[in-house]
Structures are given as structure tokens and as C-alpha cells.
């Protein structure tokens, strides 16, 4: 059962910083659908990408898996029985619900769900790694190191999907897309109070980068091919491929 997100519908005296606690986990499916434009498209396309990039005998990582939406989408399209998905999140509330959610659906692809820090979890023999709206919650100083580790753990020909909320160098365009995102949330039933309170809680926790900064980091990590494949307002997703020799 999906619970409606009304966490911020009444004034909160002391907001504090955002955490992925039990209250957020309970309403997360509704929250993200109503807050992130294009989220359903990205999830379904991640499933399609898994069908293309998964290789027998390899591992697929869903880093910052939340309740497992991307993991489920990938399991539906992977045809190799000996390909394993490893889903990782550091929130106990998210991981608990993710385990219950994943176990409710039968699939032939083995799936391991781990409560751990994505900055330190080993990445090995990977054909696909997914960071779906996760990097933006890491300290900026940790981001390049994580990408370097992902690149090292990917097999040649493997891919990284990196979905994020973006900031923009062009202030006019950035302001327009920011306003359009708020229009999107209003259209999905969020009040001005809800939008304002959630933004206040996120502003010290979710630190966004421009597409250009993301691409620069990916190139520095070693990815020979990196491009934006999806964008809706100030949300989007990049795909990066670890090149075969000579590519």
C-alpha cells in the first residue's frame, strides 16, 4: 500500500536537516513520483539498459537503492540467471522496506540487499552500476573517489547510470527550470508550505552539480564515453561506458 506524502503539510517549528528515516520511507514512493519529474521514465529505462548491459557471471549494483525501484526494473529485464544484483543503501528504514518490497516479487535474478555506505562497499566484476539520485547526497569531496572506484570495478564495456538533480551555470535557464519544477510539484498537489519546508530541510544535505561538472568527473575517472540521455526540467540522467581497448 502506498501512503500519501503529507509530512510537511503542517508547520514544523524546528525543521532540521533531511534524513531518510522511517517517516520518509513510509511515503517515499508517493513523494518521489510527485516530486521528481520523469522519475518513472528513468526507472523503466534503467530496466531496459540492464537488459542491454547485463552479462553472464557479472554483478549489477544499485547504489543508494532506496526501496528498490531500479532493482525491480532491472530484475524484470535481465535474462541471465547467473547475473547478480547488489542493492545498497545506508538508511535502515529504507533497507528494511526494500527487503520486504523485493521479496514480494519472484525473479530468477539473485538479489542481495545490503545496509552499508556506498562510499566503501566493494565494487567488483560489474557490468552495470546505477546511482539513481544518490550522488547529490554525498559530500562533494567524496564524489570523485566514488566514481574512480566504480570505474575500477566495472568490466570493459560496462556502464554507469548517474541520475541527479542539476544546477546550471546559466542563471536565467536555471531559474526557469527551478520554477518549472515547483510548478510540477504544485500540479501534483503540494502546497507552498510543503514545498518550502521540504526545500529548507534539503538545502544543506542535497548539494547539486551542473551537467558539465558531472561529465568532467566522469572523464577524470576514466570513462571514455559520457552523455546526458534523459532530462526533464532540472532533473536528468547520464550514461557513461567504460571503453573497450582502443575505443
Curated annotation (Swiss-Prot):
Pfam families recorded: Methyltransf_25
The keyword Transferase belongs to this UniProt entry's keyword annotation: yes
EC class name: transferase
Binding site for S-adenosyl-L-methionine: 39, 89-90, 117-118, 132, 199
EC numbers: 2.1.3.-
GO-annotated molecular function: carboxyl- or carbamoyltransferase activity; S-adenosyl-L-methionine binding
Entry keyword annotation includes Cell cycle: no
Catalytic activity annotation: prephenate + S-adenosyl-L-methionine = carboxy-S-adenosyl-L-methionine + 3-phenylpyruvate + H2O
HAMAP family per the UniProt record, alphabetical: Cx_SAM_synthase
NCBIfam families, A to Z: carboxy-S-adenosyl-L-methionine synthase CmoA, PRK15451.1
Subunit note: Homodimer.
Function description: Catalyzes the conversion of S-adenosyl-L-methionine (SAM) to carboxy-S-adenosyl-L-methionine (Cx-SAM).
Listed name of the protein: Carboxy-S-adenosyl-L-methionine synthase
